[in-house]
A protein has these predicted regions:
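Cys/His-rich zinc-coordinating modules
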Residues: 7
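Internal glycine-rich flexible loops
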Residues: 10
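N-terminal secretory/targeting leader peptides
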Residues: 1-3, 13-203
């Protein structure tokens, strides 16, 4: 997440800032959570096992990944995932490893499959109200700006990574089965994702 967050900031500054997506507010940082993993109630032996399963997916690229893999998408806000998994509304979820601890998913999804390179990465922006920023003292404003940008992006990514380490430790302690997807599965995954990338580039 740290490397992805720094890369995200640099790419934004070089190529995307000109689009002025954050017009009217001040962008102080960009970050990406750690690599999403596949968390399921039953073991995953191949990507075909995901077809038709009720998987909670996020919006954006995560939703596109789920669609390409043939899952039955369950759209829920993150705070609702534990309940959805514990009551059978969902069979699994695509989220980072840290959620095994932070969302207590170790209690409801005992199987985790790690896709080398990550299933996907979700992005976030840190923004500040311009009026609020203008109302601060010059010293306070400069202090905020001084730790913003790439510094804040890197720090956020660093904390995402640390949370994933904690999540992995909690999962192991709980007896969660953790498997790394084979080279064959990863190859198939990348082949499936080629169309997702093409659609994104074309959009």
């Amino acid at each position: 997440a740290e490397a992805a967050s720094v890369a995200y900031w640099r790419v934004h500054q070089k190529y995307l800032a000109k689009a002025d997506e954050h017009k009217g507010v001040t962008l102080v940082g960009l970050t990406s959570h750690g690599p999403a993993v596949i968390q399921t109630k039953s073991p995953l032996n191949s990507l075909d096992d995901l077809r038709g399963q009720k998987i909670r997916v996020p919006g954006g690229v995560g939703s596109s990944v789920g669609k390409a893999l043939g899952v039955t998408a369950v759209k829920l806000p993150a705070p609702k995932v534990y309940e959805a998994l514990s009551t059978g509304v969902a069979d699994g979820i695509f989220m980072p490893m840290e959620t095994q601890k932070s969302f207590r998913l170790k209690e409801v999804v005992p199987h985790v499959t790690i896709m080398p390179g990550g299933l996907y990465y979700g992005s976030f922006a840190f923004i500040m109200n311009n009026d609020f920023l203008a109302g601060l003292s010059e010293n306070d404003r400069n202090a905020i700006i001084g730790v913003s940008g790439e510094k804040l992006s890197q720090l956020a990514g660093e904390h995402w990574d640390a949370a994933d380490v904690d999540g992995l430790a909690a999962a192991k302690e709980a007896g969660t089965t953790i498997n790394k997807a084979s080279a064959e599965i990863r190859k198939k995954y990348l082949e499936i994702m080629a169309s997702v990338e093409q659609d994104w580039v074309a959009s």
